Amino acid sequence: MWDYIGDYGLAVAHPLYILIGQIFLFLPTGDMAFRLNFASGVGMSIALANIAVLAFQLTGRQWIGIATALMLSVMHTVWWLSTIAEVYTWNAAFMTGELLLLIHLIRAPKWQAAVALAFLNGLNWSVHNLALLALPVYVVVLIVLVKKRKLPAWALAASAAGFVSGSALYIIMIVFLALKKGDLWRAISSALFGRYTSKVLNVQTSWHFLKHNTALGLLNFVNFSVPLAVIGWFGMKRCLGGFLAAALIAITVIHFGFVTRYPVPDQFTFLLPSLVMIMLAASVGVSVLAERSKKWRIAVIFACAVSVIMPPIIYAKTPKIIELTGIKVKRERQRPYRDEIRYWVIPWKHNERSAEQFAEAALKQALPNGIIISDLTAYYPLVLVQQRDNTTAPEVSVKLLDTNEKPGRKNILLDRSVFVVLPDLKFLAPDIMARVEIRREKEEVLYSVKWTNP
């Protein structure tokens, strides 16, 4: 159980996503990394299929459903997250399923739909805490339907039971942590915030990460999605009815409001739910324009086609354009082999091997029996490559950064060659770190640790 919880709190445990990933590990092709990356693509495929159905249900036109899914599929964040092992695409898969049930519940209120919606939202909570952002809207919808006597009052209790059933895996982990730590509130806080309470509850925009995340986020909108969405929002009440329009707009505002003030390095990845909601509004906008006249219908079809064709071309050309303009993009921590612009701007990753190249070179440098002290970013590539090529560097030890000095560690480090992936990693007590020299030769990828006064 503790392997699922980890050291960063329940909020980043994602237990159902881990179970989904374990299922994909049974695939008979590719290595572990390929299978888990493939799982992200499958999750996004489910979400896109749901989006097509959602847009069809909102507009009554199949071609709008297909066009909406295609436009969303080539958005930068969507494509980027579909190629790497991350949790967000599966959150989108469950979220779009929830939206299908929400529309059904509002248009044809039945207690079964309410329970199914709550159950699916509970499952999604076991995937990612982003599921909780739409929960207040669902609760308000249920209360309104009960107040209007379109649902029986006991449907609220049944829905609550459905949510608890869906989130049973996560709730079990909360109970386990509470019993282990002897503190229920600490377990609940871990489930809701993990170690990121100040960031989750942040009420202002952080400029530290805003610059590059804004640039990456804007790549999602090199199309006609925003003007189509604006038209859709203005026409949503007329096309969908005030109740459904209010619910969809409320979910959009909550998700977009959350991501704009969530100060984390990968802030742009949290845009995915907002992009889903924006494209649903865009589908309504397409319908509004298509209804005006034949000329408008042709024009909006052309806009949809451009929105599918142009983004990949822009992604491919952007690194070259940045190079020609002389703009320098550097990180505080430079990673060997990684072209930062190519890594972040181009969403397809089938030919991006910087992590693999680094791991191969690092393990070779640490031969025959060195110790590599790694941060979290480099740790898993090192371990995966070592497991894959188990005859290359079997005696090399890869250690995740641990700032807690342990008895005997200094003596072990004195007996073996020691390397760090970054020069600022503090892996020993300050008084001992002051007595080591960390340097890297020109052709090396790791920094060697040399004791100046053993």
Question: Where are the predicted features?
Answer:
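Transmembrane-helix motifs of polytopic, lipid-linked glycan transferases
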Residues: 38-59, 97-101, 233-234, 280-284
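Short acidic/glycine- and proline-prone juxtamembrane loop motifs at membrane-interface regions
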Residues: 80-88
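Signature aromatic-anchored transmembrane alpha helix within multi-pass, membrane-resident enzymes
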Residues: 238-241, 286-328
